Amino acid sequence: NGYVGGYMTKKLVEMAENIGFELVTIIDPNAVLAKDVRLGKMAYIGKSATINSDVEIGNYCIINTGSIIEHGCRIGNFVHVAPGSVLVGDIHVGNESHFGLNCSVLQGLTIGNRVIVGAGSTVLRNVNDGETVVGIVK
């Protein structure tokens, strides 16, 4: 189980680096980032995304259009946050996880490695490694 895109991205990154490509971070000019946000290598921050204070984004992450990452979140490597998703404050996310379109995650939760959160879901509890969750997740 887990986010296939994370695996594919890892393979593409490995191939690109092996042949000498320089991989860069891309931040849309309409994105809003607090001054103290820490971004890993080759992050993509989409149009109108908002990343607030004391947030750490790992390597090779996609924070897509209109997503909101609130204060104190820690996002692992190869994580995709789809358009319109909201991660409220102090959430810890493992590696290779995927947050579907317009999902919401409650403050202070831990989301494991290789987790898939379905589109439109509301997550109200911690999610273990490898879980796929949909709907209202209690």
Language-model features: locations:
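Structural signal for interior beta-strand "rungs" in well-ordered beta-sheet cores
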Residues: 25-138
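Phosphate-bearing ligand-interacting subdomains
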Residues: 1-29
